Amino acid sequence: MLDNQTIATVKSTIPLLSATGPKLTAHFYERMFKHNPELKNIFNMSHQLNGDQREALFNAICAYAANIDNLKVLLPAVEKIAHKHASLNIQPEHYQIVGTHLLATLNEMFQPGNEILDAWGKAYGVLADIFINREEQIYHSGELTDGGWRGLRPFRINRKEVKSEVICSFEFAPQDGGKVMDYKPGQYLSIYLQDDSFANREIRQYSLTAAPNGSSYRIAIKREPQGIVSNHMHDKMQEGDTVWLTAPRGDFFLDIKPETPVTLISAGVGLTPMMSMLYHLHQQNHNSPINWLHAAEHGGHHAFSHEVAAIAQAMPNFAGTIWYREPRDEDQQGIHYQHKGFMDLTVLNEALKTEGMHFYFCGPVAFMQYVAKQLLDMGIDKQFIHYECFGPHKVI
């Protein structure tokens, strides 16, 4: 535990940190990658270029300083980050490297003196121990689970299937022929790739898109115009090729009782964790109302529509509503989609106000902000709202 003087000293730096903004974390990452370039094989360097990771780390540092005397407030964020770290196979020695560069960054930017540096050193040590212990629990639990493993495991691509003009699904089976551990609906895999065309090893997280079966995993990947990994997977990786995976991770998953009504909301490739949730509900014979709301650019970008339709036929409590922003001539309203334009939840006002209904959603950040605002404006309590960001976490 931290003493009162250390807590007060760390809190005294909040105005300085806030005034500096993400310049602090930009300096930190630049320094760390210069002195420890091997870490480029762990971090998603695309998020370094667009600034998302710098902003996320800056927000995390400020949140830690502000709540250092009440760490329970940070537990949800710790859980999310710990799962992400476990998917990246982060080890205790990585925390020592990060701590060294964090303190050096504070010293180089502010020259705050030994008292502040010592306080931040103690504070970082406490936080690092929290993460190290939680991540070890995640690793150990995975090892003990039937079909589980620690670290990386080689898989082969069993099946590659086009799901839309921009989305391909990939089914992986372990090369050792063994079982694979179950996962919670909404969780993700990390895929590790190395290629001569890459500057570094690349690691990406992709949501699982089916129900657990003990023998294989399925994900879906959207081709991003500048995406190093997504284009490689779409264009280069074929059935029979090898990839390396860490075990399923993630703190965003369906967690409701059988009698709970639920609405699954998505846009674009954000439907991938919802597919896993929908298959789970079908597998469990969920008999309470299920609303499936999805937004796509048009029919050519609408993935998994046939799979969802098949599940819908088997579940009388299922109600699907689709929005196409710009339907093509061949997209038929009432058959392929119900509404044109952006997702307007007021058309389902009464259905969404079912008592005790939970809402899970995923998609582009602007879409999720738009959805969250509509739900809150309807009077939906925050405790019933759950969401997942692809990439560094943002508060919606």
From Swiss-Prot:
Site keyed Influences the redox potential of the prosthetic heme and FAD groups: positions: 84, 388
Active site: 95 (charge relay system), 135 (charge relay system)
Residues noted as binding heme b in the record, renumbered to the chain: 85
Catalysed reactions, as listed in the record: 2 nitric oxide + NADPH + 2 O2 = 2 nitrate + NADP(+) + H(+); 2 nitric oxide + NADH + 2 O2 = 2 nitrate + NAD(+) + H(+)
PROSITE patterns attached to this UniProt entry: FAD_FR, GLOBIN
Keywords: Detoxification, FAD, Flavoprotein, Heme, Iron, Metal-binding, NAD, NADP, Oxidoreductase, Oxygen transport, Transport
Enzyme class: oxidoreductase
Role played: Is involved in NO detoxification in an aerobic process, termed nitric oxide dioxygenase (NOD) reaction that utilizes O(2) and NAD(P)H to convert NO to nitrate, which protects the bacterium from various noxious nitrogen compounds. Therefore, plays a central role in the inducible response to nitrosative stress.
Name of the molecule in the record: Flavohemoprotein
Natural source organism: Photorhabdus laumondii subsp. laumondii (strain DSM 15139 / CIP 105565 / TT01)
Phylogenetic lineage: Bacteria, Pseudomonadati, Pseudomonadota, Gammaproteobacteria, Enterobacterales
Gene name of the encoded protein: hmp
